[in-house]
């Protein structure tokens, strides 16, 4: 059966729409570009081009995976974040646009003489690499508990030719020496309650639960980082963490309980509480 690019896109968009995809046009285009190994502009320039039988078979196989709910990023193996192409795998969370807000907040709070940033739970390396790409004189360290994630992040650094970042394996601060002090510590840790019904919906069904779910109503890892972060921050340094849209008020309270000052919450692009930060200052 011969199909043009235009006809194949139209048919697949209809199928994706019926299955409830919230971005059927984008999904279909990304999958077809991946199969054809062509940029998006190619689909617009050559809509009448006939797709080969082999290409059609490959496309239909990927489309079936998407129709079953598998995230596009896992199907094609990459996701763009902060304009950086990043390889992803089912061992890591898929980088999301909302997390770019954490990168923006970190960059906004860097002083001219800042030297080091620590990213905890780095996953694909998205946050660490985004910051490192903007500030090539900074030393950036990313930490993840999963060996596979650390190797993936290292690969993403090579792909993007970013040399001022280092990735280490370990649980939170475990691979960091107490003699190491940072201007800023950032993290997008697990913060979802295990009973949250959203865990059975959408892309998160396919993502590693260990990177999503935390005890104490989703606060356990946030609190752990807050407690121990004080030991690794320079005087006047900032801790900033991404969290759920309903956790901002409680998290500000926890920050203040732990002695941080200038505590505030920043909103994401949809106006929801997304990043809470506090400054650690020691009186001499």
UniProtKB/Swiss-Prot annotation:
Family membership: Belongs to the protein N5-glutamine methyltransferase family. PrmC subfamily.
Keyword Cell cycle tagged: no
Record field: transmembrane: none
Gene label: prmC
Name of the protein: Release factor glutamine methyltransferase
Reactions listed under catalytic activity: L-glutaminyl-[peptide chain release factor] + S-adenosyl-L-methionine = N(5)-methyl-L-glutaminyl-[peptide chain release factor] + S-adenosyl-L-homocysteine + H(+)
Enzyme class: transferase
Functional summary from the UniProt entry: Methylates the class 1 translation termination release factors RF1/PrfA and RF2/PrfB on the glutamine residue of the universally conserved GGQ motif.
Binding site for substrate: 188-191
Gene Ontology MF, one: protein-(glutamine-N5) methyltransferase activity
Organism this protein belongs to: Aliivibrio fischeri (strain ATCC 700601 / ES114)
InterPro entries linked to this entry: DNA_methylase_N6_adenine_CS (IPR002052), HemK-like (IPR004556), Methyltranfer_dom (IPR025714), N5-glutamine_MTase (IPR050320), PrmC_N (IPR040758), RF_methyltr_PrmC (IPR019874), SAM-dependent_MTases_sf (IPR029063)
């Amino acid at each position: 059966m011969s199909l043009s690019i235009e006809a194949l896109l139209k048919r697949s968009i209809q199928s994706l729409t019926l299955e409830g995809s919230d971005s059927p046009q984008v999904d279909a285009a990304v999958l077809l570009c991946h199969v054809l190994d062509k940029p998006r502009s190619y689909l617009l320039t050559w809509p009448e081009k006939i797709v080969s039988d082999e290409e059609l078979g490959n496309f239909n196989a990927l489309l079936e995976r998407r129709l079953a709910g598998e995230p596009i990023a896992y199907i094609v193996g990459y996701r763009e974040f902060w304009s950086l192409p990043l390889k992803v795998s089912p061992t890591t969370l898929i980088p999301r646009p909302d997390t770019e807000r954490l990168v923006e907040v970190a960059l906004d709070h860097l002083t001219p003489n800042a030297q080091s940033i620590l990213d905890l739970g780095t996953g694909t390396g998205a946050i660490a690499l985004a910051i490192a790409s903007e500030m090539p004189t900074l030393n950036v360290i990313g930490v993840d508990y999963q060996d596979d994630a650390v190797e993936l992040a290292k690969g993403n650094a090579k792909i993007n030719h970013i040399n001022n970042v280092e990735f280490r394996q370990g649980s939170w601060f475990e691979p960091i020496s107490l003699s190491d002090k940072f201007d800023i510590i950032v993290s997008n840790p697990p913060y979802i309650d295990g009973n949250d019904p959203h865990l059975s919906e959408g892309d998160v069904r396919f993502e590693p639960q260990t990177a999503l779910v935390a005890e104490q109503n989703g606060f356990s890892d946030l609190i752990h980082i807050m407690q121990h972060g004080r030991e690794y921050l320079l005087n006047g340094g900032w801790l900033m963490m991404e969290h759920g849209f309903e956790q901002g008020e409680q998290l500000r309270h926890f920050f203040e309980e732990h002695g941080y000052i200038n505590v505030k919450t920043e909103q994401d692009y949809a106006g929801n509480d997304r990043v809470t930060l506090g400054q650690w200052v020691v009186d001499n």
